[in-house]
């Protein structure tokens, strides 16, 4: 028995050393990429991370930020396949000449819905739609995507994300970090962190994690008056609506797992600061320093989202009737927890 315990301890130490070594390697590569990146300075005259969403209870969760008129229109024509990313993806051009990035895999439904809820809270997102089935003309001799597009060029269950024309996009080493941006300490940034935790988005990597793929970016938009606005946003909401946690325990699009963590969504409130149960890629940056007043400000918008909107958004994102019912109830429970904080200042 003592020999077995010794062996187990040695194995555990070896695994721990291996994990630490991998993370140190990723950190070093990310640091190198950021330091050696060719400068792409932000050209905007102002920065934004949030805008007033208006009458939240009237927003169309089925169509999302792009609206019904913004949906992809067939026929779709193959443009190129992408080798990056954890899931198969390619670009297509639709009947209106717009380019879409098409993705398959376990993030399709969660990402499509998560962008709708973040949008309803006032945050910038990329326009995304769920397309149940279709055909991509010219999609032959594919690599990874060959498992998602048949020999007849037909596909099922895809997320179409618009590649918006005229927008200058700063990705990866040119993005932003949770602890270094123009909004540090503001209610707008803290509100975004709450949305991340509300949706159980455990993959909140930023520019410091560029070796593994940063999920933050800056999009420069030219406004009607000619002003260039730099919009700070999260560009990957796929790792949501499941369980947060350490590697090996996380999940995506898993209602039972998502619901099982509702009781630990908020741990408590002390001296006006909220304590959270969330664990993700950047746990400390997501959870620290969020006050009751931050939650009250955010709930002015999120609190107006109706169950009907949640359900319609989920169904439009590919959820089954059962999944839509489960997620609607589970999300409402978390929103009710935020409401309780707003009312009592405690939990």
Regions found by a protein language model. Give the residues of each.
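Extracytoplasmic/secreted envelope proteins and their assembly/folding machinery
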Residues: 89, 111, 115, 192-195, ...
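Regulatory N- and C-terminal appendages and interdomain linkers associated
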Residues: 2-78, 94, 307-347
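Extracytoplasmic/periplasmic, Sec-exported soluble proteins
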Residues: 84, 106-110, 183-190, 286-290, ...
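Conserved kinase catalytic-core segment
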Residues: 108-111, 116, 171-248
């Amino acid at each position: 028995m003592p020999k077995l315990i010794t062996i187990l301890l040695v194995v555990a130490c070896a695994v721990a050393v291996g994990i630490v070594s991998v993370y140190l390697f990723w950190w070093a590569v990310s640091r190198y990429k950021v330091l050696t990146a060719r400068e792409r300075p932000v050209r905007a005259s102002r920065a934004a991370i949030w805008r007033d969403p208006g009458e939240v209870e009237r927003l169309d969760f089925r169509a999302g930020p792009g609206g019904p008129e913004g949906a992809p229109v067939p026929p779709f024509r193959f443009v190129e396949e992408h080798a990056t990313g954890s899931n198969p993806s390619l670009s297509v051009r639709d009947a209106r000449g717009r380019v879409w990035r098409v993705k398959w895999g376990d993030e399709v439904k969660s990402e499509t819905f998560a962008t709708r809820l973040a949008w309803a809270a006032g945050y910038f997102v990329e326009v995304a739609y769920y397309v149940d089935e279709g055909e991509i003309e010219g999609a032959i001799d594919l690599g990874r995507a060959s498992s998602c597009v048949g020999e007849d060029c037909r596909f099922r269950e895809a997320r179409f994300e618009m590649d918006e024309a005229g927008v200058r996009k700063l990705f990866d080493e040119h993005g932003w970090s949770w602890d270094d941006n123009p909004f540090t300490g503001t209610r707008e940034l803290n509100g975004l962190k709450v949305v991340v935790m509300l949706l159980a988005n455990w993959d909140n990597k930023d520019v410091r994690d560029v070796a593994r793929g940063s999920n933050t970016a800056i999009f420069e938009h030219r406004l009607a008056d000619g002003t260039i606005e730099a919009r700070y946003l999260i560009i990957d909401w796929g790792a949501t609506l499941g369980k947060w946690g350490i590697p090996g325990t996380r999940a995506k699009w898993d209602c039972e797992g998502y619901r099982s963590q509702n009781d630990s969504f908020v741990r408590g409130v002390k001296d006006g600061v909220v304590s959270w149960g969330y664990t993700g890629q950047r746990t400390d940056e997501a959870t620290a320093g969020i006050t009751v007043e931050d939650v009250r400000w955010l709930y002015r918008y999120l609190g107006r989202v109706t169950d009907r909107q949640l359900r319609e958004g989920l169904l439009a994102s590919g959820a089954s009737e059962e999944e839509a019912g489960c997620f609607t109830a589970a999300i409402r429970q978390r929103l009710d927890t935020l409401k309780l904080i707003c009312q009592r200042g405690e939990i």
